[in-house]
């Protein structure tokens, strides 16, 4: 029995998930998930009775991937989402892209891996107390390091292409969608009334612009992933009470899921609040 987070139609409504775009901006393919039109504002209203079961399916999928030790990549680069994407991905020990998606991030993974190695080399140089480089040279390396870290920091420990993507706004992240489709990587995505559902493996009709809505989606995704990890740990005989201060990951070795412990990247609530506030001043 899975221990998925609970969510109701009321929860969705209170977070504004039902508010779509102006009717002039709609994508006709999303029509099956539209309830009607708000006559005063002339925006489409999303049918939350259809959103809820699709959301629950997506949550179960994320749970299953996490249970099997899969890699999950959170993608959301729009201003309303970028800090939420990072903090929630980190909270469950997964990976994220929250600034510009670089073309080939999935389809040219070899080059991306090389760039990640370069990033780590820069960090090693900058942390070398015995470095003979000049202040100017170190400054140039610091700038290059910051640029790479902004683009790749959220996937530096991913190790390989992800098993599934969780995307906020498929229109903005169309390159990520295209690359995932090309490689056959499943996609869980929030689709607003101006979005194309074609090729999205697990779609969730909903408002992809409201921070409150985005916070709800990401929290549910993260809680589902954590539930999957905890169930996997319990099956491995690890006591959940013992994982405080540590992060457990599941890695596949020779077809077998191995449970390993590594330094936690999970924010404490107070730490997350500080980071979020700093990001919002961007």
From Swiss-Prot:
Domain of life: Bacteria
Region (Disordered) residue spans: 260-282
NCBIfam families in UniProt: rpsB_bact
Similarity section: Belongs to the universal ribosomal protein uS2 family.
Biased composition (Basic and acidic residues): 266-282
Pfam families with a match to the protein in the record: Ribosomal_S2
Name the UniProt record assigns to this protein: Small ribosomal subunit protein uS2
Single GO MF descriptor: structural constituent of ribosome
GO cellular component, as recorded: cytosolic small ribosomal subunit
PROSITE patterns: RIBOSOMAL_S2_2
Alphabetical UniProt keywords: Ribonucleoprotein, Ribosomal protein
GO biological process entries: translation
């Amino acid at each position: 029995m899975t221990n998925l987070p609970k969510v109701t139609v009321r929860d969705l409504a209170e977070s504004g998930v039902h508010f779509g775009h102006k009717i002039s901006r709609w994508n006709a393919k999303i029509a099956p998930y539209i309830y009607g039109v708000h006559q005063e504002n002339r925006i489409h209203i999303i049918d939350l009775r259809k959103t809820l079961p699709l959301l629950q399916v997506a949550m179960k999928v994320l749970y299953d991937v996490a249970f099997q030790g899969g890699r999950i990549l959170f993608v959301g680069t729009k201003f309303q989402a970028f800090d939420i994407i990072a903090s929630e991905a980190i909270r469950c020990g997964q990976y994220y892209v929250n600034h510009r998606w670089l073309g080939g991030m999935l389809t040219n993974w070899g080059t991306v891996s090389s760039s990640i190695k370069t990033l780590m080399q820069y960090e090693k140089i900058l942390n070398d107390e015995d470095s003979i480089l000049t202040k100017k040279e170190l400054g140039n390396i610091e700038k290059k390091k910051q640029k790479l870290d902004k683009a790749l920091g959220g996937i530096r420990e991913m190790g390989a292409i992800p098993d599934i993507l969780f995307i906020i706004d498929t229109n903005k992240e169309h390159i990520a969608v295209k690359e995932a489709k090309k490689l056959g990587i499943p996609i869980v995505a929030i689709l607003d009334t101006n979005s194309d559902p074609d090729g999205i493996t697990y779609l969730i009709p909903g408002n992809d612009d409201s921070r409150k809505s985005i916070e709800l989606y990401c929290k549910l995704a993260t809680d589902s992933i954590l539930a999957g990890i905890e169930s996997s740990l319990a099956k491995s005989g690890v006591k959940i009470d013992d994982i405080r201060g540590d992060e457990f990951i599941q890695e596949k070795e020779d077809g077998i899921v191995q449970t390993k412990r590594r330094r936690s990247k999970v924010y404490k609530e107070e730490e997350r609040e500080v980071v979020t506030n700093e990001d919002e001043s961007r």
